[in-house]
């Protein structure tokens, strides 16, 4: 065979092979970029969860005492609603708690669930409180709890058996 026949065929073969190599390389780079984008989306969701307002889950409390009652005001984070908040008394402790479950799903159908929980416990022993009189109101993200004091100043007649 002569060089004049082999050389053009070899050049064609190399050119075709180079085109295929470049196409494969471009395809691999595109796949890597897509994987990186998916990974970044998941990382962004996780970071938003981690960097969420954890400090807001520990709201400020303001406790005021009057001669007849105690009033406790708790600033609850904006993302909680009334149905997610509870107020209980157990073992001479006032327990204010809130719980929320938030579900995320992105375009790739990746699902994540975020839980937010807040709980504040206040010792109310030795306060002479009438626990049956507790009232709670939630308005403008402020939970106001009113507990009346027991009245020992009234005279109570006790029957003798």
Curated annotation (Swiss-Prot):
The keyword Metal-binding does not apply. InterPro entries: A-crystallin/Hsp20_dom, HSP20-like_chaperone. Pfam families: HSP20. CDD domains: ACD_sHsps-like. The keyword Disulfide bond does not apply. Keywords: Stress response. Belongs to the small heat shock protein (HSP20) family. This is Small heat shock protein hspJ. It comes from Dictyostelium discoideum. The gene is hspJ.
